[in-house]
């Protein structure tokens, strides 16, 4: 049943992304002309560490204006990945391999308050964890669907410095995430700075701290990040697991 549920999440995610891609596609000829800012934002990325990997992507649209103006936002997103962990079961160490997939649909609003830019979303999320072999002591298994809340903030601190905070929570496996970045533009729109984050669910919390580089241009951005993470499961390990992240975003 768990495998069937995971496949259903994957099929839903694939169908949604294909449908959105077909709807948002535009002729290449239109890109040759200088145009007003677009109303679509598409992103994709990969996140990996020694025990965890995740491929993710999503689309945000502004149905009543361009992507930089205040107003309603619609978003669909999802991802697929895997992870491993160990635990003592029946007096001996047991290794577990897991696959995970998620999909979400959200509606929200984008508002500017001077140098502060804020987005808030509400919606529904489906998250699946398929653990092999079945772990009787792991509460995060199977598929759960529940409401989701998202808050995103960007603050310009002068002409060169900025900070970013992203927060999310869903009742599906009590999954939550928080990420903080502080950037400084060292040349044009090339920024570098520190980042930190926490990811949690019913199984426990993972924390990370590292550095990132972000390059932005008219209509897009690309960022790379790396550092160390800690998997706070049974023995609350310190931050000693290297991680890397790459993210690409386009607005059109």
Predicted segments, located by residue:
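Cleavable N-terminal export/targeting peptides
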Residues: 1-39, 252
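Outer-membrane beta-barrel initiation region
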Residues: 2, 28-71, 130-132, 141-147
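Short loop/turn motifs that connect adjacent beta-strands in outer-membrane beta-barrel proteins
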Residues: 29-39, 62-73, 112-118, 156-162, ...
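Outer-membrane beta-barrel "beta-signal"
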Residues: 52, 211-217, 238-252
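Outer-membrane pore/translocation modules
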Residues: 72-175, 196, 226-230, 237-245, ...
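Intrinsically disordered, low-complexity segments enriched in Gly and acidic/Ser/Thr residues
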Residues: 176-179, 184-210
